[in-house]
């Protein structure tokens, strides 16, 4: 029998959640997702040593070490990672808008347009890129504008049905509901252990998937943030799943039978809902898990963005010495 990874590929688009060039070349995912954490990790590998040198040299020509130049070099490096990944996968690469813009709709739109233009300068068209935005109200509204301009978006840090409903109304190309981080919250909050079937993260994604398919919503559901292969197997059949190299390797080594768990042909009828800003914010306020994990996720990505910029500043300083 073929591996569980190959069986999964037959029913779900497999995406690699990594900037590891060697892993992507070896595991052959359709798409890749990145975030500030992944970009930072990738830039510490030999594969991107030349990209770092090039970006620093470019930064020196822009006039040194101002905050604006440092931010521009950091952007250039994130695009370098994305461009390298785009050369290895046939599909899309997700690149994230700065986490510190998560509550600024217009700034997020401006940054997204800049990312798309930066990729185009490297010969990579917008059809190959997904703009990642946090699923705040402001991020979702930014996605609505960008989608109307033909810029496809990946709404990330999604932890609730309310976020999923708002993303659908914005006609987002894709959402990334987080599985493992939801599990983390419930384990810490309740002290309980969960099976793959009772895993609150799995239950959340299944609920969102059912709502979308029952209402003919075209937004792609891509489960993310997995803690174990059990969660992945429990979502087999989901539109897409973005998976770390370690878990992809584990699936590749397992030749057991993989059972399909999700199918658009097997959903329960569910009423279509609509949320204005007040209703969205109230729903989030009532969901402690979603509120806490969204805020935490933004803080963590913002922290890694600061770390990336600090690295850039040090490199620029060293180059000037």
Swiss-Prot record:
Reaction catalysed? Answer: D-sedoheptulose 7-phosphate + D-glyceraldehyde 3-phosphate = D-erythrose 4-phosphate + beta-D-fructose 6-phosphate
The EC code for this enzyme is: 2.2.1.2
Query: Which pathway does this polypeptide act in?
Result: Carbohydrate degradation; pentose phosphate pathway; D-glyceraldehyde 3-phosphate and beta-D-fructose 6-phosphate from D-ribose 5-phosphate and D-xylulose 5-phosphate (non-oxidative stage): step 2/3
User: Between which residues do disulfide bridges form?
Assistant: none
GO MF annotations in UniProt: transaldolase activity
Q: Which domain of life is it from?
A: Bacteria
Question: Which Gene Ontology cellular-component terms appear in the entry?
Answer: cytosol
Subcellular location per UniProt equals: Cytoplasm
Could you state one GO biological process linked to this protein?
carbohydrate metabolic process
Q: Which residues form the active site?
A: 132
Q: Which family does it belong to?
A: Belongs to the transaldolase family. Type 1 subfamily.
Q: What does this protein do?
A: Transaldolase is important for the balance of metabolites in the pentose-phosphate pathway.
Q: Subunit composition?
A: Homodimer.
Q: What is this protein called?
A: Transaldolase
